[in-house]
């Protein structure tokens, strides 16, 4: 059981290298490298743009008192898809593109929705207090008294 992560990493690297060699054989090495860089740029922009858009949508649902769990699952799947596209390799790109498909996102939402709980805190996160305690409201005015000051002669020569 403790060898399972090592075997999984080895299989992942083997699959990525095998696919990379096959694609480079068909398209050429330069075009293959350009394709890998292109998918990384797409992944980076996807994480930045779609993640922020879904975060705003989640906040709107929470403000309306609705359950934002579906948007949370969609946001997480978009972020994971973007990260998979960001990693170099065609196998991770394929998995990332799968997570971008709406039927896959819907299937994930249906499977994960029963495991998520949503609760809303009444009154928001912060309260202003009831005004109790020993707080007094008042005004003051500063008056300088000349008697409290010592006169000092300046003997310096300019």
Curated annotation (Swiss-Prot):
Gene of this entry: fxsA
Compositional bias annotation for Basic and acidic residues: 139-158
Ranges in the topological domain labelled Cytoplasmic: 1-16, 100-158
Record bears the keyword Transferase: no
Biological role: Overexpression alleviates the exclusion of phage T7 in cells harboring the F plasmid.
UniProt keyword rRNA-binding, yes or no: no
PANTHER family: UPF0716 PROTEIN FXSA
Region (Disordered): 125-158
Cellular component GO terms held in the UniProt record: membrane; plasma membrane
Biased amino acid composition, Gly residues: 125-135
Family of this protein: Belongs to the UPF0716 (FxsA) family.
Keyword set, alphabetical order: Cell inner membrane, Cell membrane, Membrane, Transmembrane, Transmembrane helix
Protein's name in the database: UPF0716 protein FxsA
TM stretches of this protein: 17-37, 79-99
Pfam families registered for this protein in UniProt: FxsA (PF04186)
Membrane-related topology note: Multi-pass membrane protein
Chief location bin: membrane
């Amino acid at each position: 059981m403790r060898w399972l992560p090592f075997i999984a990493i080895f299989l992942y690297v083997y699959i990525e290298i095998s696919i990379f060699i096959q694609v480079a054989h068909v398209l050429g090495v330069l075009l293959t490298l350009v394709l890998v860089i292109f998918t990384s740029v797409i992944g980076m922009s996807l994480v930045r743009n779609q993640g922020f858009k879904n975060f705003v949508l989640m906040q709107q649902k929470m403000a309306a008192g609705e359950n934002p769990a579906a948007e949370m699952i969609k946001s997480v799947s978009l972020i994971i898809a973007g990260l998979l596209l960001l990693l170099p390799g065609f196998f991770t790109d394929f998995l990332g593109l799968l997570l971008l498909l709406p039927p896959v996102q819907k299937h994930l939402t249906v499977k994960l929705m029963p495991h998520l709980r949503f609760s809303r805190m009444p009154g928001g996160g912060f309260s202003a207090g009831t005004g109790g305690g020993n707080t007094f409201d008042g005004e003051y005015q500063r008056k300088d008294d000349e008697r409290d000051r010592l006169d000092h002669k300046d003997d310096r020569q300019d």
